[in-house]
Amino acid sequence: MLAVSSHNLWIALAVTLAAGLATGLGSLMVVFAKKPNPRLLAFGLAFAGGAMVYVSLTEILNKSIAAFSQAYNDKLGFTFGTLTFLGGMLLIMVIDRLVPNPHQSLSSDDPQFREDNRAYIRRVGLMTAVAITAHNFPEGLATFFATLESPAVGMPLAFAIAIHNIPEGIAIAVPVYFATRNKFYAVGASLLSGLAEPVGAGIGYLALFSVLSDAVFGTVFGLISGVMVFLALDELLPAAKRYAQGHETVYGLVSGMGTLAISLVLFRFATP
């Protein structure tokens, strides 16, 4: 069993919790602020997508290959890393087919959101919360294990996931707020959904703690990299394109990749 630093463990839990609670920021935008700028939202979503794709392919997948290589040899390490990456995409693809995509939820501009249709709105809110909660479990695992192994990798990933969680908080808060007219319920529902990330991380860690090894880390990182790339391509970029009014998606994507690339270089120089 691999030794895990207690310092990294607490950092990983804190970072995962912070990323999950970003859903609350989205709900606050609904109940207290004006309608979000769609161009800024498009840029932010694409930025998060670019960051997630970059860190998944350049850092997390490479950590999977390195861990498998430590457990076996270089050829098998590359093979198993690639297979678990593809397995991660297949896994989240199945989940995505079984659970509705949270970014396809109705908005407050939808004609269905009328005062006399609160039962329908309440049902939409419940379905959205369940869908987003299900999607948050693998994101929590990704943030936690990436930070547990290397905070320099996990923190930028958590930042990208936090940006991604803001519109999810909006998606939950809109129907809940319209159905109940209660700000506390809207914010609370979003925060509870976000807590699925640290809960998922805790369950995953407890399940794997006794068997942590190079092979297990390789499997987890391979699956995480596949899941993150699929989520970025299937959820974040299409959602960004939907809000964009120009080239915000491309600019956000490139900015996200560039920012993550520079931050990882700086982390390398900052660590001894």
UniProtKB/Swiss-Prot annotation:
The protein's location, in the record's own words, is: Cell inner membrane
**Known InterPro entries for this protein?**
ZIP, Zn_transptr_ZupT
Q: Main localization of the protein?
A: membrane
Give the binding site residues for Zn(2+).
E139, H164, E168
What topology in the membrane does the UniProt record assign? Multi-pass membrane protein
Extract one GO molecular function annotation from the record: metal ion binding
Q: Where are the transmembrane segments?
A: 11-31, 40-60, 76-96, 126-146, 158-178, 189-209, 211-231, 250-270
GO cellular component terms?
Answer: plasma membrane
Q: Keyword set for this entry?
A: Cell inner membrane, Cell membrane, Ion transport, Iron, Membrane, Metal-binding, Transmembrane, Transmembrane helix, Transport, Zinc, Zinc transport
Family membership: Belongs to the ZIP transporter (TC 2.A.5) family. ZupT subfamily.
Q: What does this protein do?
A: Mediates zinc uptake. May also transport other divalent cations.
This one is known as Zinc transporter ZupT
Originating species? Xanthomonas axonopodis pv. citri (strain 306)
